[in-house]
Design a protein with these regions (language model features):
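Short, surface-exposed, charged amphipathic helix/loop patches that serve as local interaction elements
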Residues: 2-113
Length: 113
């Protein structure tokens, strides 16, 4: 494992701007297989029209609306709905981690003063 990979793995989850999800069940698209998704930490505008409570509770319907907005490669709505439950859960867990305050994740809040 390279030093860069080690730094990425040990980085405070509250400070990550992306998260990689390796799919248990790859997505077939045009003769190719998508085996990994990269989720971007959503900004407030990306969450427009969504319930933060539902996202933190990892409610599938709410997560399915958010995923196409934050995932690379971009997924179609049908592809998101066809995700296997284990893959959906991995994505939902990353979303919840993105939204959780640092204090909830057990990391101290650094003072800027």
């Amino acid at each position: 494992m390279s030093t860069a990979e080690q730094k990425t793995e040990t980085k405070n989850p509250a400070e990550r701007s992306t998260a990689d999800v390796t799919l248990d069940y790859p997505i077939a698209r045009s003769g190719q297989k998508i085996t990994k998704l990269t989720l971007r930490k959503p900004k407030a505008g990306t969450l427009h029209g969504l319930s933060l409570t539902a996202l933190m509770q990892m409610q599938a319907d709410e997560v399915m609306v958010l995923l196409p907005r934050i995932v690379e490669p971009t997924l179609l709505e049908k592809e998101v709905r066809d995700l296997e439950p284990s893959d959906m859960l991995q994505c939902a867990m990353e979303v919840a981690t993105f939204l959780a305050p640092k204090a909830v994740l057990g990391y101290p809040i650094e003072s800027k003063a």
